[in-house]
């Protein structure tokens, strides 16, 4: 096989290669789109990009472009999570190959056709290909849910397993992966329901632009619920995958898995409930968030001491000093950084978002709309 053939085989058949390809596409897209940002516009870079690439940007269509851009960014992210799941959770090999192939074709089609439709003229063919790409990603999710079915006795755990399981042997971590997958499919369908009405009375909106609109339409509420739950489920999936990386097990694992399952289900119900039960939906979402946050906290409680212990054992140190323990904790920046990010992100993003939602009328609605909009956009990003 030629050198190019070997590289292509690596990029499109191995987990590392597939992830690298998705990250590269996302990075190139981010680099391109950053030239259209506010600061770049002030320096004249935006106009250069538009002229050189022949972009067709109409200000009245900005919201639609942003929606397509968000989806073009998130499809590779979803694909990366799928790759990690098929590589780290036991499923049949042929299922893994089929799922990875489908989601790869889907996200690549969605990204390039979506950006083409949004920024380079509104070709109906590109719009159709965008929908085909999204549909393929959705179909890959359906296959993943089937492959992850946790009540398949082939994947039951023994009674003495250190991993969370029921008395009958059902692997609760596998249940958590399956629940998140099914919830993601349902939440994607919620967004698709709103998207299906484009051109039939539904106009594109950005959630941050209608936060103080006293009466929101059913489809606008569906968009708000869709964007919140999709981000939340991506976060929970990342937590579950980190648990696999750290070989999360034992007492804290048995506590965390039920909480993550309950949190995922509760948050999903709450976000879907925004459509019909707006007055109580936030309370349901808060409850689910607390369960999920507790599960993530237990991973940190397990992971940090495990990092210290593993490195001290490698260095054959029995009675470590405080400095040696800190060195052991920080020695692997990737693993420490992943755990630290859980703490940092929750204090600076999740808790801030919940606090804002609880105090909307009391505090934040007294602020100028511009300030509230900035806070919301920062929280979501």
Give the ranges of each region predicted by the language model.
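Juxtamembrane "helix-exit" motif on the non-cytosolic side of transmembrane helices
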Residues: 114-124, 271-280, 362
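Hydrophobic cores of alpha-helical transmembrane segments in multi-pass integral membrane proteins
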Residues: 17-48, 61-90, 95-117, 131-152, ...
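Membrane-interfacial, low-structure loops and terminal tails that flank and connect transmembrane helices
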Residues: 1-17, 153-175, 309-337
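Membrane-interfacial segments
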Residues: 90, 155-156, 246-247, 308-311, ...
């Amino acid at each position: 096989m030629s050198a190019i053939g070997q590289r292509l085989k690596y990029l499109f058949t191995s987990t590392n290669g597939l992830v690298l390809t998705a990250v590269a596409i996302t990075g190139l897209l981010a680099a391109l789109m950053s030239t259209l940002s506010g600061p770049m516009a002030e320096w004249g870079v935006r106009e250069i990009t538009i002229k050189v690439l022949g972009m067709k940007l109409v200000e009245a269509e900005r919201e639609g472009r942003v929606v397509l851009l968000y989806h073009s960014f998130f499809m590779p992210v979803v694909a990366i999570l799928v790759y990690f799941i098929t590589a780290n959770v036991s499923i049949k090999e042929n299922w893994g190959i089929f799922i990875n192939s489908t989601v790869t074709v889907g996200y690549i089609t969605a990204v390039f056709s979506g950006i083409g439709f949004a920024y380079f003229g509104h070709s109906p063919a590109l719009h159709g290909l965008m929908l085909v790409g999204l549909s393929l990603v959705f179909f890959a999710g359906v296959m993943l849910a089937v492959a992850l079915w946790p009540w398949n006795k082939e994947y039951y755990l023994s009674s003495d397993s250190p991993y969370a399981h029921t008395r009958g042997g059902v692997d609760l971590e596998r249940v958590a992966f399956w629940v998140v997958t099914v919830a993601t499919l349902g939440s994607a369908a919620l967004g698709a329901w709103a998207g299906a009405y484009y051109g039939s009375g539904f106009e594109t909106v950005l959630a941050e632009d209608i936060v103080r609109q006293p009466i929101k339409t059913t489809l606008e509420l569906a968009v708000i619920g869709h964007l919140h739950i999709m981000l939340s489920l991506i976060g929970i999936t990342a937590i579950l995958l980190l648990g696999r990386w750290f070989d999360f097990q034992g007492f804290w694992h048995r506590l965390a898995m039920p909480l993550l399952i309950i949190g995922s289900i509760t948050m999903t119900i709450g976000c879907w409930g925004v459509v019909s039960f707006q007055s109580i939906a936030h309370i349901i979402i808060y409850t689910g968030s607390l369960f999920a946050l507790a599960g993530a906290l237990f991973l940190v409680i397990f992971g940090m001491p495990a990092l210290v212990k593993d490195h001290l054992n490698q260095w054959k140190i029995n009675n470590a000093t405080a400095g040696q323990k800190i060195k052991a904790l920080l020695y692997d920046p990737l693993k420490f950084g992943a755990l630290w990010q859980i703490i940092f992100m929750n204090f600076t993003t999740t808790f801030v978002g919940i606090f804002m939602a609880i105090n909307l009328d009391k505090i934040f609605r007294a602020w100028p709309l511009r300030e509230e909009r900035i806070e919301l956009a920062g929280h979501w990003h």
